[in-house]
Amino acid sequence: MERNNILPLVLLVARPAAGKSEIIEYLANRIEDSVRSKDYHIGQINVIDDFPFLWRWFEEDDLLERMGKDRLFTDQNGYFKDTAYWDLLIQLINLEYDKSLKDSDIESGYTTILEFSRGKQHGGYRRAFSLLSDAILENLAIMYVDVPWEESLRKNRERFNPQHPESILEHSLPDEKME
């Protein structure tokens, strides 16, 4: 497949625990490069996922609390103190994408996959999409993974590994955050 047939940027959209990270894992590590490019128009993969940013905030807040300081981002129940932090996560995705464009390793033949999930209570996808940079929107393809809520909830409960709650593939949300 010619490099110009490779999608430069794909946003993977779905509910939490709908399989977004598993799709990325499959595309990146389970099939040959030639199959991925020919069948899916996906090149070498660069992933920008907001979960590592989010998890880092939880860790930083826990550390601050242990130091006797106020938590910055989240309350003790894991909810953001300010809904603006959902917007900040999108701005961090924009920033990481801009930085990746400067990376000489990320060139034609690469596909950047953006991954995040949003609920209605803080603006949903409409709000998140409105904050994506022009650099992203100019090249964006969107792949929606349609998974029933019940299946997403089941997978969310099953995938949790208490030994690795920071894991992209093994973290979960409390049921009330899934609604």
Q: What is each stretch, according to the model?
A:
Residues 1-179:
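Glycine-rich phosphate-binding loop of ATP-dependent small-molecule kinases
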